[in-house]
């Protein structure tokens, strides 16, 4: 998985910041063991923080999540159906978002028509722990994963808060 930039609140911090996030999987293994945050805001510019997941906790890695998406009967059937209709299914970049002592994975699916039109967002896939969902919007996909009711329209969105312990090095 390639590193990517995001805005999030790091564990122990009071405000969000712009970071470069890199998830880590062990050599020849597929599970996730840690993630690294490279801070980009002052006064912490250039500082690196490594967050290890607890040793006894299994956190799925990107390859495991991709395999689970491919093996999901409903998702696989939909992708096959869209591909046969003369369109191309484009899988967007898989994002790993730290939440508590685990990861939320988010991957958009785009559909590009044969006639060269710009791809349109068709579905959003989310995965957390053993749960996986594919819905028309991110909000609906998150509701499938976490349950609950939709947020009120006037409610301001709240960023995810990562919770993990920095590694002692």
Question: Which role fits each region the language model picked out?
Answer:
Residues 1-169:
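Accessory, solvent-exposed terminal regions and/or long lumenal/extracellular loops of proteins
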